[in-house]
Amino acid sequence: MKMTDIQIAKENLKGHSICLCKDGAYFTDDGRGISPMLRFIGEGRDLVGCSAADIIVGKAAAMLFVKAGIREVYGEVTSQAGYD
């Protein structure tokens, strides 16, 4: 059975702070906090439609995911503000 993008992102999160996946291709980062997302957005990466797995999803991270067009998010820890 083929893994979904969110399953691939979750599987490859181990040892990293964030993993983004789209159409089976994934990339990871080990930066702290929201710095990986800020860097990805600043680099002009096309994140629309990606699935994301992150260690901690708070309000700021959730807002960046929405701004970037992330399709779905898995957080090992998610704050109520991040969920809302």
Where are these regions (language model features)?
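Conserved mixed alpha/beta catalytic, RNA-binding, or beta-rich assembly cores of soluble enzyme
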Residues: 2-76, 81-84
